[in-house]
Amino acid sequence: MTPESVMMMGTEAMKVALALAAPLLLVALITGLIISILQAATQINEMTLSFIPKIVAVFIAIIVAGPWMLNLLLDYVRTLFSNLPYIIG
């Protein structure tokens, strides 16, 4: 196992992790921003008012993007397992 192969595997793992986390984080960010704007406009400062919609939005995003996320993760794991003999040496 060469240092280049370790770096390549690490880079691919980070790309997959970022691709899996990005949609959920963006949904939470956009939902939080919208709720914060509404709270500022109505002067309602309730912490649970921003927390519950974020959870619901992320849950919906998981349902919508779940098959794509699962496919991406399975493709990465299949590639990793198929290259295992070459990695071990």
UniProtKB/Swiss-Prot annotation:
Membrane topology type: Multi-pass membrane protein
Gene Ontology biological process terms in this record: bacterial-type flagellum assembly; protein secretion
Any coiled-coil regions, as ranges: none
Keywords: Bacterial flagellum, Cell inner membrane, Cell membrane, Membrane, Transmembrane, Transmembrane helix
Transmembrane regions listed in the UniProt entry: 18-38, 55-75
Domain of life from the UniProt record: Bacteria
Location relative to the cell: Cell inner membrane; Bacterial flagellum basal body
Major localization class: membrane
Pfam families associated with the record: Bac_export_3
Record PANTHER family: FLAGELLAR BIOSYNTHETIC PROTEIN FLIQ (PTHR34040:SF2)
Family listed: Belongs to the FliQ/MopD/SpaQ family.
Protein name per Swiss-Prot or TrEMBL: Flagellar biosynthetic protein FliQ
Organism, scientific name: Salmonella typhimurium (strain LT2 / SGSC1412 / ATCC 700720)
Organism classification: Bacteria, Pseudomonadati, Pseudomonadota, Gammaproteobacteria, Enterobacterales
